[in-house]
Amino acid sequence: LIVDGAHNPAGAQALVDTIKYIPKENYAKCWLLMGVFADKEYKKIGQIMSDCSDTLICFKPSGDRGLKADKLAETMQQYYSKVIIEENAATAIKYVLEHASDGDMIISFGSLSTIKMVEDAVAFWEVAHNV
């Protein structure tokens, strides 16, 4: 699991450039989770990140600035073959951890504010599943 702010195009490109150093044989599938504020360049961020995966899970960060997951998903349909809508970081993490296989890579990005939310959701899931 990689959790990165990547809340602007430069950050997204840096993340993609870093991911390219991970040999593809080291992971079976790459899952992307994106929660972003409405005032960010989310279309460009999502387009850049599509170099890593064809699957995107969209969620709304908490607070008034958070872009609704359905709006994000609608925008991202052109870049990803599979776009999933989840209510928040916790449900996005729950979804991906229930559907990902051992050896899959999971990357969460889009807002610095979601880092703690994602970390908390993972910790809760691990406790609930005795991981």
What are these regions (language model features)?
Residues 111-131:
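Glycine/aspartate-rich loop-and-adjacent alpha/beta segment that forms the canonical ThDP
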